Amino acid sequence: MKKILIVDDQVEVRELVQVTLEIGDYQIFSAENGRQAVDVARAEHPDIILMDIMMPGSEVDGLEACRRLKSDPATADITIVMLSAKGQESDIMAGREAGANDYFTKPFSPIALIEKVEQVIGEN
């Protein structure tokens, strides 16, 4: 069974993404901040991580979590897709520079998200 990690500080967003992906045969994990994301990714090694960039109040935001995961040989191969309300070119570039493989701006199309997940899962 393929594994997906959803990372967002807002429980509503995590639940929305999970409901969107329930059509597939996936094992879904969630984390509410970057530190938890790194811990879960190291323990479970998901096939894809869907991660928010901004997580106010968190010691580790999505960009820093992405950097940590991509610099760790044990997790560097995990595909990371950023999900963010920040959609400026500079935000997208910051995500790419941190190591993100793709970037979706919120609100995102559920169909596009499903297609991206299926593409990544199919490649792994």
Locate the predicted segments by residue.
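Two-component/phosphorelay signaling modules centered on CheY-like receiver
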Residues: 11-29
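Alpha4 helix (beta4-alpha4-beta5 surface) of REC/receiver domains from two-component response regulators
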Residues: 18, 60-64, 87-102, 115
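Short amphipathic alpha-helix used as the core "switch/output" element in two-component signaling
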Residues: 39, 61-76
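Active-site beta3 strand of CheY-like receiver
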Residues: 44-50, 55
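His-Asp phosphorelay/catalytic-motif detector in bacterial-type signaling
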Residues: 45-47, 73-79
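Short, conserved "switch-loop" micro-motifs in signal-transduction and mechanochemical regulators
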Residues: 72, 86-87
